[in-house]
Structure formats: structure tokens, C-alpha cells
A protein has these predicted regions:
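Conserved AdoMet/S-adenosylmethionine-binding subsite of the radical SAM
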Residues: 1-77, 83
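C-terminal accessory regions of radical SAM enzymes
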Residues: 61, 77-137
Length: 137
């Protein structure tokens, strides 16, 4: 299909640490290598990104920074972002329910308000839905 979907899930290093992911420099290095190899092979392939809003430790400001990063560093504007859902037996679920970093015991910001979780997502996708779910007048 000419595309590869990867799951950086976020771009802010602090949030990535809570997700157990490498920092944003790894993502940029991978993207650059992918583009270089495509160009050398004469291919027109591209990356799509799986991103998550409202993960434990993620704030509205982190989502604003994600939007800036994807625009400037990745040169793309995400159309899909998933809102974090805690899954059983995961470290992220422990963080969500305890509101603590299980490795340090420190209090962790966790957005649990449904509207504010949606707001984190909307920072990225607002204006892209063109009225889906709403009546245009």
C-alpha cells in the first residue's frame, strides 16, 4: 500500500518515559532513515503514526507540543488520535488508577474528566472532522 504505520504514541519525552517508549530523537532518526531509504530505492512510501491522548502523565500542554512537533519535525498533521484506555495488567493502567508513578512513588497527573480527555484529543484533530456528528447550518 506504500505506507507503514508506526506507534510512537506521543512526542514529548516526559510522556514517552511514562509509556516506556524511546525519546522523540529516535522517532526523528527513524523517519529520516525511512525517507532516505525510500529516496534511494525510488519509492514513494510514507509513514502514518498511531498517537494517544490523555495517557497518564500527559497534559493539555503536552498535546499542544505534540501538535507543534508533528507539524514541524514530522511535517504532517494527524487525522487520528486515540484517547488512552487503561488495559488490565499494564503499567499504564496502574498509573491511571493509582495516579502514581509505580517506579518512583511520585504523584502523577492523570486526566480522568471525560470532556478534558476529549479536549486533549481535539487539540490534534479539531477542524479535521468537518462536522462529523454535528449538523451543519
Amino acid at each position: 500500500s506504500g505506507q507503514m504505520k508506526i506507534a510512537p504514541e506521543h512526542t514529548q519525552d516526559r510522556v514517552l518515559k511514562y509509556m516506556g517508549k524511546p525519546g522523540s530523537k529516535s522517532l526523528v532518526a527513524f523517519k529520516d532513515m525511512f525517507n532516505k531509504l525510500n529516496k534511494a530505492a525510488g519509492k514513494k512510501q510514507f509513514l502514518t503514526y498511531y498517537l494517544i491522548a490523555a495517557h497518564p502523565g500527559c497534559t493539555l500542554e503536552d498535546m499542544k507540543q505534540l501538535k507543534i512537533f508533528t507539524s514541524k519535525e514530522l511535517r504532517m498533521h494527524p487525522e487520528q488520535v486515540q484517547i488512552f484506555t487503561p488495559l488490565p495488567s499494564t503499567v499504564s493502567a496502574v498509573m491511571y488508577y493509582t495516579q502514581e508513578d509505580p517506579f518512583t512513588g511520585r504523584t502523577l497527573f492523570v486526566e480522568k474528566d471525560r470532556a478534558k480527555r476529549q479536549q486533549q484529543k481535539d487539540v490534534i484533530v479539531a477542524g479535521k472532522r468537518h462536522g462529523k456528528g454535528r449538523v451543519r447550518r
